[in-house]
């Protein structure tokens, strides 16, 4: 049995709206080496306020890991959950950035930003992990420092955003961090391992987080939470 999300009006997902055609096949939780490590990183990001849920119920932030069949990504409507476990992830097996569609399996459909994650894996063969997080101070700090960014007219969850991110990943392979200018407060990091991406985000917070210069930990709320 499959369920299809065809339009943004029809498919609210707790992160805003799914803007791609989503073919979801209900299935057991994905079995993926490294998933526990990915979920542990996600929990650290949640505790740091880089992933979470706003008062209106809209979630923000998602993580993914390349697999032999595609990639696993945190599922839709999970932003407010601290620890997901395998059940909180969806396996994306097929996608088309140009066609604005993807196919996924799991107890829940893939995140609304899953197509952007797919674009990174497609553009950079060395990328194994992708993190999309939100932070106003980090967003502003990276921009002020001249970080790479997507166009302002490329909105979240759209083919335009996916293409823009893929272009950066293709030009700067292996690892990088960028600002999603058309997705307020949104940043995206990618790299060859979970550890590499975690280190990249920590480095960015340490060096570009506007409100806490010199802090060696993730501290988006003014207090240090994670080393």
Label for each model-derived stretch:
Residues 2-227:
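Glycine-rich flexible loops
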